[in-house]
């Protein structure tokens, strides 16, 4: 497979050298908000006469670099903003092709590391102990340790992490024991081993007052004790989802599949860290209705973690295939009509995102060009939903779900433990369906892959479960003031929480509604009392876009009490666009930003045009 440049990394590319293994020894210092330690990187030269190599770093302090017991020279280049600073290391002897060297780097992270959020005890559920978690995707691993911070390089890792003894450390690896810290009796060392090679964006660490409960033969759910029972209930379907995923993708190679429920500031719905999926507590709806996120993270164990996008330009390969698998898992559990219902909801989400960006915006392309673009800034639902739409369209073109799932399983088998580009994927698609090349040649590949805006074709969707949502939303959107008395709580009696959410998504596409309509909707449906995060989010957006002043404190509360960017960013944007709440939104952001996740704080700041 030809070399493609990773414009998001300043390190030597995989064609020059490859990190094969990391041994991390570090200590977590809550008082100084720093990780201090050594990263021993086993690097294999990919060419003859290699005399130096470059690693990614970001806001790191480097103490020294040691090779074969000798300190060696290194230079830290100028900072290049979100990309960090290249670190060039001189090798004491030139390496020949395939020769390995162990480079031991002593480093310390910055309190402002973009990869880490340090929480005070007050920011936790238990209020007694501090908490730390990492989020490396896409390019923040370099803000924890020097590395080739590119998904084109995969490595195994082992780690020893020293933490205060009343706390627990977990990583994206198999737990490998714990022992008192010989250097400090008030601390404990936790050991970890990840034997499957992974891109370094999947390295993850959490430290806190964590407890666990077993919910399946290979699954513990971890959280602070205040959430552990609720989480065990919410995610009880995990093992049945894993079994379906293995049926669709092949054997689960990672051993353990644990779940970690994080504090509310965690910026994503979930993060597929191997052996330990991280999830937002906003999934704790009480009725398992948001468990599709678990199906999504489980699916990444194949698409993303085994078969990985070679650069972030091809992120859709990770996310499109993962959404495709996720919806098949939910289809197996809840029926094919349910799969189509979520697929169609995803098309609506795609329309919304394209409308927000503008239909000619380069970030609405499936394959993006991230040269001089921070992947966090480009991040959106496009790679998920445009990617899914392409695969769903191909499923229908090529003979249905069973046929296309056969392709997906073969794709995973072919490219496991590798990193791939869109061209690799497309070549394999053509090879797998060599008897259907005529059909494949009907696809407008250029439009699907490289053009902005909506895809050239909309797939076919079963609308059975969506129809009720559309019908009720139409009634509201077309209602005159004198019609408002015709609505009652009976309207909702046959709708699932998924359908209620879709109803609000449909109405939101037509926002603003007259204020009288919104007040009447609250009067008959009492949406303010609903705690399901997805439903509450769409309801509050509808209220603010329709200029209901009474909703301002509720929207501000939701935007700040949790930090999942899917919710926080649009809520802040809507509040800033409403004259009655603009100043309050900016003020609230400025008051809260010091205790927000660093990436969330940066992006909300951009959204609000402050800083």
UniProtKB/Swiss-Prot annotation:
Disulfide bonds: none annotated. Its EC number is 3.3.2.6, 3.4.11.4. Inhibited by bestatin. Inhibited by captopril. The epoxide hydrolase activity is restrained by suicide inactivation that involves binding of LTA4 to Tyr-379. 4-(4-benzylphenyl)thiazol-2-amine (ARM1) selectively inhibits the epoxide hydrolase activity. Keywords: Acetylation, Cytoplasm, Hydrolase, Leukotriene biosynthesis, Metal-binding, Metalloprotease, Phosphoprotein, Protease, Zinc. It comes from Rattus norvegicus. This is Leukotriene A-4 hydrolase. Pfam families: Leuk-A4-hydro_C, Peptidase_M1, Peptidase_M1_N. The modification N6-acetyllysine is found at residues 73, 337, 414, 573.
């Amino acid at each position: 497979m030809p070399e493609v440049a990773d414009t998001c990394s300043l390190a030597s590319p995989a064609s020059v050298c490859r990190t094969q293994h990391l041994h991390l020894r570090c200590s977590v210092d809550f008082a100084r908000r720093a990780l201090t330690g050594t990263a021993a990187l086993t690097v294999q030269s990919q060419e003859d006469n290699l005399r130096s190599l470059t690693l990614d770093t970001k806001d790191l302090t480097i103490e020294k670099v040691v090779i074969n017991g000798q300190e060696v020279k290194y230079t830290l280049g100028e900072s290049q903003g979100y990309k960090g600073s290249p670190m060039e290391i001189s090798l004491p002897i030139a390496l020949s092709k395939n020769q390995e060297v162990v480079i031991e780097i002593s480093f310390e992270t910055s309190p402002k590391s973009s990869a880490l959020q340090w929480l005070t005890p007050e920011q936790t559920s238990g209020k007694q102990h501090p908490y730390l978690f990492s989020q490396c995707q896409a390019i923040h691993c370099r803000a924890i340790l020097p590395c080739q911070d590119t998904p084109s390089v995969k490595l195994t890792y082992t780690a020893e992490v020293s933490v205060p003894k009343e706390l627990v450390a977990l990583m994206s690896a198999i737990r490998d024991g714990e022992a008192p810290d010989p250097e400090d009796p008030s601390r404990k060392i936790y050991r970890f081993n990840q034997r499957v090679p992974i891109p370094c964006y999947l390295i993850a660490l959490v430290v806190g007052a964590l407890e666990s409960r077993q919910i399946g033969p290979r699954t513990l759910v971890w959280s602070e004790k205040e959430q552990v029972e609720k989480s065990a209930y919410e995610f009880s379907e995990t093992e049945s989802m894993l079994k379906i995923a293995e049926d669709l993708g092949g054997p689960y190679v990672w051993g353990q599949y644990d779940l970690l429920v994080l504090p509310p500031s965690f910026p994503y719905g979930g993060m597929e860290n191997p052996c330990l999926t991280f999830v937002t507590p906003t999934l704790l709806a009480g009725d398992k209705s948001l468990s599709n996120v678990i199906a999504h993270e489980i699916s990444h164990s194949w698409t993303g973690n085994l078969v990985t996008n070679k650069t972030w330009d091809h992120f859709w390969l990770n996310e499109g295939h993962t959404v495709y698998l996720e919806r098949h898992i939910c289809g197996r559990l809840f029926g094919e009509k349910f799969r189509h219902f979520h697929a169609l909801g995803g098309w609506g989400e795609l329309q919304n995102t394209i409308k927000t960006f503008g239909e000619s915006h380069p970030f609405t392309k499936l394959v993006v060009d991230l040269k001089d673009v921070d992947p966090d800034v480009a991040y959106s639902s496009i790679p998920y939903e445009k990617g899914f739409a392409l695969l769903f369209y191909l499923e229908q073109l090529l003979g249905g779900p069973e046929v296309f799932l056969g392709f997906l399983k073969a794709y995973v088998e072919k490219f496991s433990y590798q990193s791939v580009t869109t061209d690799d994927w497309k070549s394999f698609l053509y090879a797998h369906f060599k008897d259907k090349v005529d059909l494949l040649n009907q696809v407008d590949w250029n439009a699907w892959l490289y053009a902005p805006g909506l895809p050239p074709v909309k797939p076919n969707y079963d609308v059975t479960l969506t129809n009720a949502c559309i019908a009720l939303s139409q009634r509201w959107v077309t209602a005159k003031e004198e019609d408002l008395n015709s609505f009652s709580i009976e309207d909702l009696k046959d709708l699932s929480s998924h359908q209620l959410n879709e109803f609000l998504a449909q109405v939101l596409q037509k926002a603003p509604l007259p204020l009288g309509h919104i007040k009447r909707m609250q009067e008959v449906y009492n949406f303010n009392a609903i705690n399901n995060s997805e439903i509450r989010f769409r309801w509050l957006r509808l209220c603010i876009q329709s200029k209901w002043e009474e909703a301002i404190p509720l929207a501000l509360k939701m935007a700040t009490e949790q930090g999942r960017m899917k919710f926080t960013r649009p809520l802040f944007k809507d509040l800033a666009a409403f004259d009655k709440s603009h100043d309050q939104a900016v003020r609230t952001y400025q008051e809260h930003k010091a205790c927000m996740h660093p990436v969330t704080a940066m992006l909300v700041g951009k959204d609000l045009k402050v800083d």
